[in-house]
């Protein structure tokens, strides 16, 4: 039976894990089992945070657009409905940026909605 030398593989795997958990407190960065568990928990939490950030930013963009639109007498719902109906490809992030940085361009969009409604 041939001899299998796998010391380097295990050492490399542990080293990668310990670099991930290097800033953790106590045995969470020293012992392999607890570090492995905490590393997995950290990766799950970071993924959850990235997903949550997308939700939070979308809600923020909607609030900003709604505030800018309501100052001119239109609801957010009407704005989005008009954009879809006329195939204007502006997502919520871009609309929010236009509403903050370039009010004139944003109100041109709103004026076109008001003209169409009558």
Swiss-Prot record:
Keyword field contains Ribonucleoprotein: yes
Magnesium in keyword set: no
GO biological process, alphabetically ordered: translation
Name of a matching Pfam family: Ribosomal_L20
InterPro entries: Ribosomal_bL20, RIBOSOMAL_L20_CS, Ribosomal_protein_bL20_C
MF annotations from Gene Ontology: rRNA binding; structural constituent of ribosome
PROSITE patterns per record: RIBOSOMAL_L20 (PS00937)
UniProt subcellular location: Plastid
UniProtKB keywords: Plastid, Ribonucleoprotein, Ribosomal protein, RNA-binding, rRNA-binding
Database matches in HAMAP family: Ribosomal_bL20
Protein family according to the UniProt entry: Belongs to the bacterial ribosomal protein bL20 family.
Function noted in UniProt: Binds directly to 23S ribosomal RNA and is necessary for the in vitro assembly process of the 50S ribosomal subunit. It is not involved in the protein synthesizing functions of that subunit.
Protein name listed in UniProt: Large ribosomal subunit protein bL20c
Organism expressing this protein natively: Aneura mirabilis
Gene of this entry: rpl20
